[in-house]
């Protein structure tokens, strides 16, 4: 069985940096796309993405900005269905911690909150929220701060919140792993479009916003 990382599945090569657009396979994002297509909640007005991970998963700044953050912006654009109008970024110097506000040409706005600074004992926190003129679609709990309730595996040393997935995939240890597993499986089945997509344009936009 061929196993690919998200980056490999997206076509990254050793001499170039290609963003892995794994948010496209986020199950909540896919559900929001379905709601948009069915037009059952009215007009899409705004989006909010949250990505928080323990410090042990912190990547280098380059990967954090041009892979993790860029993939989130791509996910927002997939839902907005329009070109970017502007991007505002506030980043904590020397840390993988930022807030961003992206606006699209159809007046949809997307808030992006990312950090890889959580205490080691905390699980991944990964939410998407879509605000429509007549309702909301989100996996963010109405009460509490962690991911939606599900399976729990706990010992004196560890605390895990596995996410049940397709029978063909193993239980994922949190929503980030689940999303990447789905992306890898989609690539294995030939469902991931080849090529870099609009990675270069998004990366350039991030550089300009950070100047």
Each language-model region and where it sits:
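Short, polar loop/linker segments at the starts of domains and inter-domain junctions
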Residues: 16, 62-63
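A structural signal for the main folded, soluble domain(s) of proteins
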Residues: 14-16, 20-21, 140, 144-177
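Contiguous beta-strand/loop segments that form the cofactor/metal-binding neighborhood of enzyme cores
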Residues: 61, 67-149, 172-190, 209
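C-terminal helix-rich "cap/oligomerization" subdomain common to oxidoreductases
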Residues: 1-2, 9-16, 105, 167-211
């Amino acid at each position: 069985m061929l196993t690919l990382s998200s980056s490999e599945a997206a076509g990254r090569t050793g001499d170039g940096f290609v963003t892995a657009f794994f948010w496209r396979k986020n199950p909540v994002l896919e559900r929001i796309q379905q709601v948009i297509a069915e037009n059952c909640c009215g007009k899409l007005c705004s989006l909010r993405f949250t990505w928080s991970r323990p410090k042990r998963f912190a990547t280098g700044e380059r990967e954090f900005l041009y892979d993790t953050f860029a993939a989130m912006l791509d996910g927002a654009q997939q839902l907005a269905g329009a070109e970017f109008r502007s991007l505002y970024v506030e980043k904590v110097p020397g840390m993988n911690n930022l807030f961003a506000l992206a606006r699209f040409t159809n007046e949809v706005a997307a808030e992006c909150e990312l950090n890889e600074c959580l205490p080691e004992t905390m699980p991944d926190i990964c939410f998407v929220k879509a605000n429509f003129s007549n309702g909301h679609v989100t996996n963010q709990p109405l009460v509490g701060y962690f991911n939606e309730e599900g399976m729990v595996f706990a010992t004196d040393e560890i605390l895990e919140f596995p996410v049940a997935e397709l029978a063909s995939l193993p239980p994922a240890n949190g929503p980030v792993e689940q999303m990447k597993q789905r992306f890898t499986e989609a690539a294995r089945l030939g469902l991931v479009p080849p090529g870099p997509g609009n990675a270069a344009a998004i990366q350039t936009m991030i550089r300009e916003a950070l100047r």
